[in-house]
Amino acid sequence: MASEIFGIAAVFWVLIPVGLAGGALLLKLQGD
């Protein structure tokens, strides 16, 4: 069970920054 929790945490640690960066990029592109 612990390994599953760590796996999910690792996925979120990767997806959250990527999602924030992608959202910022889209806002910049729309602004231009």
From Swiss-Prot:
The keyword Repeat does not apply. GO terms for cellular component: cytochrome b6f complex; plasma membrane-derived thylakoid membrane. The keyword Magnesium does not apply. It comes from the Bacteria. It is found in: Cellular thylakoid membrane. It is a single-pass membrane protein. Its main location: membrane. The chain crosses the membrane at residues 9-27. Belongs to the PetM family. NCBIfam families: PRK11876.1-2. Component of the cytochrome b6-f complex, which mediates electron transfer between photosystem II (PSII) and photosystem I (PSI), cyclic electron flow around PSI, and state transitions. HAMAP family: Cytb6_f_PetM (MF_00396). This is Cytochrome b6-f complex subunit 7. The lineage of its organism: Bacteria, Bacillati, Cyanobacteriota, Cyanophyceae, Synechococcales.
